[in-house]
Design a protein with these regions (language model features):
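N-terminal strand-loop element at the rim of the active site
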Residues: 3, 14-15, 19-77, 153-156, ...
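Short hydrophobic beta-strand element within catalytic cores of glycosyltransferases
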Residues: 296-299
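A short, active-site helix/loop in glycosyltransferases that binds the activated sugar's phosphate group
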Residues: 143-166
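Short His-centered aromatic/hydrophobic patch
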Residues: 94-101, 118
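Conserved acidic donor-binding segment of nucleotide-sugar-dependent glycosyltransferases
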Residues: 311-322, 330-336
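A conserved mid-protein helix/loop that constitutes part of the nucleotide-sugar donor-binding site
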Residues: 26-37, 199, 203-222, 239-245, ...
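Aromatic "clamp/platform" in nucleotide-sugar-dependent glycosyltransferases that forms part
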Residues: 260, 279
Length: 376
């Protein structure tokens, strides 16, 4: 474990931090839980401001942090609630663009240091893209330090006017073997899903626009020509579920929508391939878990995926149905390539920062920003 906060080691009052989170991203939510656990263990007082559903899903209170329900909204009531929580904070750390913007509003007129972490590339088009650029400029100019989870995000923050932008060592908790039900074997999981004598493919993402599920359904039409026909299972819930289910039934696609699951680790461990048709996360949780679990990954070359996985996955152009379909078919027919990807994935995962690395870096930033200034 990395050292405790320098404030604690020098007998100063406990460092009080507020983590601001929207709760809409699995990657940033998992990161905040991991960060909170590490900070609490090192003597830092942590309050997480996030929607109640985020605490139910990630149990910030379970790792020793205080949780305060703050809606994912920039309305005056929500901003006022956040401002109240931040009143006695030594430092505020916001995760993601929208959470950061709310933190900027809440800290208006105060000198409290603000650390901002950008976990993904916010994707937008047209008028929304212009608004996004304005928000980004407002946030990075107000932030004391901006942490970007990829070099691309660091460059983006600097281009928007950040005073101090740094590359962040961000890790999510590594899944452990056995997961939630250690006695539940891979063969049992496959039997429950109906994939005993056929390949099992898995995708994990909310059923929202822009996640690439339409591409997967298009690809599934071609996969019907393979013998045996692979089964694609999609773990995740969202507003497009009914639309996708109708299409699956109308076209008789070999796809099952599983809804929200708490056993994703077991599903992944039982799969032959993990599929990531699109991700704007800088450090995709699914990509990390797939490589840790030695499950070959097929992914679109978007966001931070290339930097994250290197050569340890099959990467295809974004929104290229034929390329994605072909990559899956080739991998299913090439056991030697799958084994090579497993080994390369293990080596690539070993190069990623650990949770301890992440906490150590963040804590060093906190100490730097809250260290008493010498009198001049």
């Amino acid at each position: 474990m990395s050292p405790v906060s320098s404030r604690v080691s020098h007998g100063q009052s406990t460092l009080r931090t507020v983590q601001v989170l929207g709760g809409g991203s699995a990657g940033s939510s998992a990161h905040v839980r991991s960060l909170a656990a590490g900070l609490v263990a090192r003597g830092v007082r942590v309050t997480v401001c996030a929607p109640a559903e985020a605490d139910r899903a990630y149990s910030f209170t379970g790792v020793g942090a205080q949780h305060v329900h703050v809606p994912r909204s920039s309305d005056p009531v929500s901003v006022a609630a956040l401002r109240t929580v931040c009143a006695d904070a030594d430092l505020v750390h916001a995760h993601g663009l929208h959470a950061s913007f709310r933190a900027v509003l809440a800290l208006s007129g105060r000198s409290t240091p603000l650390v901002v972490t950008w976990h993904n590339h916010a994707h937008a088009e047209g008028a929304r893209a212009h608004l996004m650029r304005l928000l980004e400029r407002r946030v990075v100019k107000a932030a004391t330090v901006v942490l970007g989870t990829t070099s691309e995000l660091v460059d983006r923050a600097r281009g928007r006017g950040a005073r101090d932008a740094r590359l962040a060592a961000v890790a999510v908790p590594r899944p452990t073997a056995g997961y939630e039900h250690p006695d539940r074997s891979c063969s049992k999981v496959r039997a429950e899903l109906g994939a005993i004598d056929r390949p099992l493919l898995i995708a994990v993402a909310s059923l929202d626009p822009g996640r690439g599920h339409e591409l997967l359904l298009d690809a599934a039409r071609a996969w019907r020509l393979i013998e045996p026909v692979p089964l694609l299972v999609v773990a995740g819930e969202g507003p497009l579920r009914a639309e996708f289910q109708r299409r699956i039934e109308d076209e008789e696609l070999p796809v099952r929508l599983l809804g929200r699951r708490d056993d994703v680790g077991e599903l992944l461990a039982a799969a032959d391939l993990a599929l990531l048709p699109r991700s704007w996360e800088a450090r995709s949780v699914l990509a990390q878990e797939a490589l840790h679990a030695r499950v070959p990954l097929v992914a679109a070359r978007t966001g931070g995926i290339p930097e994250l996985v290197g050569d340890a996955a099959e990467l295809v152009p974004d929104q290229d149905v034929d390329a994605f379909t072909g990559a899956v078919i080739r991998l299913l027919g090439d056991p030697e390539r799958r084994e090579a990807l497993r080994d390369m994935g293990t080596r690539q995962a070993a190069t990623w920062p650990t949770e301890d690395d992440t906490v150590a870096q963040v804590l060093s930033v906190y100490d730097e920003l809250t260290r008493p200034r010498p009198l001049t």
